């Protein structure tokens, strides 16, 4: 009954808005952070459109603006505050405008306090587990005229709504949320809570529904997918789930994100080599190459065990490609430690790397470490890391020259409407000159050019 009341209240708001302004209220969602946040934003989009909101063409010019925030990096946090500040005058000119802030930042008390004290233009604050309460929160704010906050944690994952995704052929399916690892630099377990897994039945139902809608490339999403199933009443391994999803008729490609190196089992590695829809690509963050740094990070694997798993993956999955996350300048990192990181980069031969200077996150254990590395040293190491990584990316892409690759055409190039972009099974970005009729299709493409970050192809029969 409560759900129906929420819908009635929110529809009343939309109807009132239409009567006042003679058009439906518009919305804009500004998303910071990881693929989990992107997926959450799609859920918010679905709720708003079901209420009667229409998407705005302008990010910072809409009747309802939602900021989906990230807490992992300080610069993402600062961007949100800057964008909120820019809306102060706009809100004064348009008092009917609604502003909401959600996501990982809002799971921490200090960030919520800053919003309360410095950004009175914000109307609604909600957490990562409270997205489905948005209709009710809108109504509460309109009734009270005051800031409404809902960050209460839930013990289950609510994934019942049919999500309206931004891409019609490539999509993400959330299989779990939270993390139990508590790496010393990471705020995620505090923001998203402990691991919770969706049921196999719920996941398979969503995958089948997406395939029926035309989706061809699906990524199973979680903070640490290799821990999937441990919290279920009848525990299931991630390998068992992957096998069941692989069997869904009509699905073309299957991926997963993200994996923790300590949890990748021999069973999973073997399955990746046998399951025909599982793509030859894995994102495997190693963060640092030094065992002493890894221990201080509480990663619970060593440089040697990481490289051993990489070799097993290379043997099991023909042509597999690797991407990773790397942090330089972690507290206590010496030049010798940094050289260990460069050694891993050279030995693995990554196709892509997300590289970061360590930045302190209040509330994490590493923030309390006394031996912080100077900023200029961090910057120097980041630049030297990229000097090693970029030539590897270049040589990896060069190896595709003249080969025929299966490419799923995903949409128009941002730079040239006559060029479409797509991905190979190994997650290589390919620019292909063809018309829009090929969007959503798998096409054989000959690679004729490249740079460090993308390939250029021509369609072949």
Swiss-Prot record:
GO cellular component: cytosol
Catalytic activity, as annotated: N(6)-dimethylallyladenosine(37) in tRNA + (sulfur carrier)-SH + AH2 + 2 S-adenosyl-L-methionine = 2-methylsulfanyl-N(6)-dimethylallyladenosine(37) in tRNA + (sulfur carrier)-H + 5'-deoxyadenosine + L-methionine + A + S-adenosyl-L-homocysteine + 2 H(+)
Limits of the MTTase N-terminal domain: 25-143
InterPro entries: Elp3/MiaA/NifB-like_rSAM (IPR006638), Methylthiotransferase (IPR005839), Methylthiotransferase_CS (IPR020612), Methylthiotransferase_N (IPR013848), Methylthiotransferase_N_sf (IPR038135), MiaB_methiolase (IPR006463), rSAM (IPR007197), rSAM_horseshoe (IPR023404)
Localization: Cytoplasm
Domain TRAM residue range list: 398-461
Keyword terms, alphabetized: 4Fe-4S, Cytoplasm, Iron, Iron-sulfur, Metal-binding, S-adenosyl-L-methionine, Transferase, tRNA processing
EC number(s) on file: 2.8.4.3
One GO MF term attached to the UniProt entry: N6-isopentenyladenosine methylthiotransferase activity
Cofactor note: Binds 2 [4Fe-4S] clusters. One cluster is coordinated with 3 cysteines and an exchangeable S-adenosyl-L-methionine.
Quaternary context: Monomer.
Function statement: Catalyzes the methylthiolation of N6-(dimethylallyl)adenosine (i(6)A), leading to the formation of 2-methylthio-N6-(dimethylallyl)adenosine (ms(2)i(6)A) at position 37 in tRNAs that read codons beginning with uridine.
Family under the similarity heading: Belongs to the methylthiotransferase family. MiaB subfamily.
Protein name in the entry: tRNA-2-methylthio-N(6)-dimethylallyladenosine synthase
Native species: Finegoldia magna (strain ATCC 29328 / DSM 20472 / WAL 2508) (Peptostreptococcus magnus)
